[in-house]
Amino acid sequence: MNDEKQMDRVQKIPITKLIPFKDHPFRVVEDESMLRTTESISMFGVLTPLIARPTEDGKFEIISGHRRAHAAEAVGLTEVPVIVRPMDDDVAKILVVDSNLQRENILPSERAFAYKMKAEAMKHQGERTDLQQGGTSVQVAPKLTTALIGEKDGVSKDTVKRFIRLTNLIPEILEMVDQNKIAFNPAVELSYLKPEEQKKLLEAIDFTQATPSVSQAMRLKKLSQEGGCKLEDMCEILAEVKKGDLERVAFKSEQLRKYFPKSYTPRQMSDVILKLLDQWQKKRQRDKAR
């Protein structure tokens, strides 16, 4: 008992002995919030202790305080206050998520993997999970796992499940969601596409210079479920004129294919078209100058 009390008190731990939590779903980035944290630690030091658990090799795995540790190292501190607390993997994962979801700005990908990590940890602890559709397991807790997560974070269980769907997106598309190039609702529908179809979708997005709306994403999902979503289908759907985008010029893939060798990819076709348009523009400018 005395050993547990000794471990749970605040200790000064060298930064060199701290390691990030494995599978940490949150990024440590140099944004405005990090700048404020760094400035505060530079002036006042680390006021709120980190929480870490001891490892077998004598180091300490950070559970809460990755950003504080990063900022402390950036300003030249060699040690930081840490509450050392032994805990199993499931408890650690839940604490990692709960301590980070309170941050100001959280990317969709961060929230998605955080919810997934917490749901899996709760499942391992014996909570019932309803993430698998069509499940027939007996409910062993008063609330479903996703409902418990949502209640803690102030969102519905359906919102939790939809965020977790985003973890099925390939990294390139998930990055577009984080950058607000693809909206959340279409992204959820796109998560049902197979990985190879998502890679084709990247080509279609690059070729048409358009991203799918919710209705377009739902159609792509339906095509995938009905036997496969081809690149040509994707290009044709994305090339459609959307509401609020009526001045955009769009072409169907078959209208362009006849002008190019069969081996040409959408990217190659796009490069040729832009090159020809550039030449045409220069010719018009020369004609006007005469």
Predicted features by range, described:
Residues 1-85, 91-105, 267, 284:
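Short, charged/polar connector segments at secondary-structure boundaries
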Residues 11, 46-48, 102, 125, ...:
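Glutamine-centric residue-chemistry signal
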Residues 26, 35, 70-168, 192:
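Amphipathic, charge-rich alpha-helical segments that serve as recognition/docking helices
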Residues 153, 157-275, 279:
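Amphipathic alpha-helical extensions and coiled-coil-like segments
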